[in-house]
């Protein structure tokens, strides 16, 4: 078989990338069969040579570049310099941190380059180098960690740790480095696990939204197209125009702007060579795209372009939607949530720099203007404000070199300066175009030494917020000095006893605290304790003994008086009780009843009180008690056994399982068929007339009275009329009497009352009744009617507050009797307890503390006497400073020690004045340079006295925690620096960002977009806010509110178009759509406006999705994203149906609405008005025409219910609906076209293939000629088929489309030969038998 193509000879190293290109070239040029064979042969070749070379990998192959040590040293040197600048107060803590991080970052980067250079120059056959750079395994970042340095890591909060990992895995990590490493590594693992699930769900949603997109038409005939240009990020090209054009179809002729020659025509598809040619001549090309395709419910072949699977025009019936969904979903697992395959190593793009190519002088041209600016490293540089050109005029009068600079770049040289070759001229900023999104962050700065604070050129301003909190912040940048000294924290209540300027020695008292007794009394010192008790008043029960009884797991104390009365102690010894507390109760059974009953007072008077505490008896008398037993039942009435009014004997069962304890008349109380209570009333029952019963009802009957003839009462009784089972009767109930004395039993007590205190304390017995007069007591077992309690009474002193009494407590104590060891006595004491400070105080800044006791045990003291003094003593000699009096008094005191000063001898004249602050490195006299910053205390001819100090640079806007003159300890916070930092890329990137875009979510911090074109006015106001106005073309001024944490991206006078961002942040695609629609609706009509709006938001979405994938180095063809975005932007929301049948709020395809509106314009009806909407993929899936597909996706019940209510039909157009109900799917490239077969029956290919065979580019099969086949030829299906069709007179090849039936005559020249059969051929069995 002869080939017309020239032989190709490759002579170069083939790595992974080139191998990809080779395979793709083989595939597009020779088809799948040849490509597969070649791949096989390459594999064999590879194994063969790998075996011969014996490539292996060992630890020795990991060669660390020898220059590494030197690079680390220079980085450390640079950091030392930065630290020195920091200690001189030239840069802030934030700038220092930033500089350290950038230094290590660039060191790590340049070390990486060295690693590569080292391998390349010393041993290009090193197995690690070959492996990584051929693309077999591993990447540069991993090689860097093996033989370079691991670099900076982030901690779990995502903050960068400024201690880099200087070692690599070959050298081994230190313990610290290992721990720091494990943060990021763990994060990577967790991330992978979470990612898999997320990515799978994303793919499912994508498939669902696009499963019904199938190529159903040849050409939709649209004139619309999409303008393509290279996708850039700032200056950097992300996807070249060449790559974006490949496999597209042109929508307009491409004309060479120089020669006017037509390079390519409309509707021509673009292969790789043509793409390259077009990209080199023009910057923007209009192509056809699925986004602009007008085919109904599908995409046409021309708009889709090549099928990237085989590099030819897409076949009819190809399910391009599903391919698109898989192409976007599959790389999802490679996208990150946070870190990317580097085990948490921090990576950041280094700024691009421009260096002088030769020596010369610098000129600014084209209106280049700059302003002074402080870089993040604290260097003062010029930043480009208005773009222009920087020109280097060589000193050898050669050709001038010019560099165009965009705003934001840093110019490191002055105009007119002369530079040497290799000098750094410019750090190129990323430019205004990129989203330099920043966030406000804060950092605390704490003091490195103790001392007093001095402000140098630092002005504090106070702001009060709405809540009334006052914050003090620095108006502009300045220095805060801490002058060294020993700061003593004074304990609460300590008063200084020295004055400012006094000189003190070790052991001198600086301040003291007095411990004062308020009430006075007798001192009690407790051994081994820091507590001093002062007894103010006490009472001792001198004749009563205290008995201690234990039993049954509980213990109790009983007080026995000399008369034999016993009181039970209610509160345990050692507890503190308040005034009027009940501490003991008389053990006494005289008032105990056996059952419940009714209580009546006879002569007894009680005070008002509460049921809980009881009613205090004021005057004695008799208590009358009429017993009865009450059973509270609360059960169903059917369980009752006795009747109301029935007389029962003791022991009778009255209700199931309840027995009466005494004989008497039963009273039954029922409510709603529930038996509440059964009351048994003991007594004698006499049947009598009603009049008599009424007379004695609820009356006391005196002894000797005859109630009924023949019945005389012999003791005090109580009458009650009852209706018994036998009729009216009088129940005579017994009455018990209890005598109550006027005064209760009281134990004898001797009390001491300390002089000066004048406070009294005594125990006082009280009788308390627990029931009111006439109260019915419900009980079966009996109750105690009266109890005698011992109450503690603390006497008040004249003229004292009630609060004092309420706060006094008495202590219950048991005292040993001096005469009898067995006996304990009860004592009640009122104490004041004072706690001494610990001498070994935990505060290391407190100085030597010594506490002296001023009283002895048993000593009587007057109120206000000093019990102890705590003295704070000086630790090192020095001069006292920093004491303030009055309102400003602070609990600290400063001593300037001799070690805080330094005296330097000088020869010549001093160059500094007294009281000035000088930073390290300053020359203070001829030849005398100080090493540390200091304050000049004294200048004389011979010497200069300095006081050590430390400056801290404070940036403008920082929050000040302290004031001038304050004393600070080491480690105290001085200021909170507020600074802007670039948002770390992982805020949202990777999968979450893709999801946010495809679900069309509104971003959290959206950018403010201009609504109409115009010119910006940017005004920076005093209170740090920025005022942005746009003067629109018709003169209208619109204001745009900017929130505090957004930075403005436009400059004054800049021209902006519609939907251009004014601030940083992510654009909201809904807003882009709305702005363009509103802007063009009036001038172009709503259909065109809707198309423009949708086109802009489509472009935004496609580019943003591409950006995310590109940032991870994943290439996806635009057309896949376009297919998905097309599905998201197909619908509009009806605002007003006009004369159509559409309802407001309905979501309908734009195409459909426009068809209806066109019909309306012909009939003269009012058209429907609508707004274009952007649906997220989930929403779009739920709003498809097919309810079966939507229901199988999410919210099944809702979707099906709505479809049923609306009476929807499903036309089964997509793949999913057909699969669900078990039909064949309406897709696939082999489906027969409706067109008749062409060319008088010679070519029988369905139109899907006729195009492949006659592909214009010769990339297809038409460029081959076939001679006779020999047995070694490799054929794939298409080749075989095309071959048959090309030579339809040959009978020895049977293609798959020829169906041979039983009666087909077999050509004579075929008989006996084995035919070449492709795998689609359907061959009749009989024919095979005959062979």
Curated annotation (Swiss-Prot):
Oligomer and partners: In cyanobacteria the RNAP catalytic core is composed of 2 alpha, 1 beta, 1 beta', 1 gamma and 1 omega subunit. When a sigma factor is associated with the core the holoenzyme is formed, which can initiate transcription.
Positions with biased composition (Polar residues): 1243-1257
Pfam family, any one: RNA_pol_Rpb1_5
Similarity annotation: Belongs to the RNA polymerase beta' chain family. RpoC2 subfamily.
Enzyme class: transferase
One Gene Ontology cellular component: DNA-directed RNA polymerase complex
Cofactor binding notes: Binds 1 Zn(2+) ion per subunit.
Organism: Picosynechococcus sp. (strain ATCC 27264 / PCC 7002 / PR-6) (Agmenellum quadruplicatum)
GO biological process: DNA-templated transcription
Record protein name field: DNA-directed RNA polymerase subunit beta'
EC code: 2.7.7.6
UniProt keyword annotation of Metal-binding present: yes
Reactions catalysed: RNA(n) + a ribonucleoside 5'-triphosphate = RNA(n+1) + diphosphate
Cofactor needs: Zn(2+)
Organism phylogeny: Bacteria, Bacillati, Cyanobacteriota, Cyanophyceae, Oscillatoriophycideae
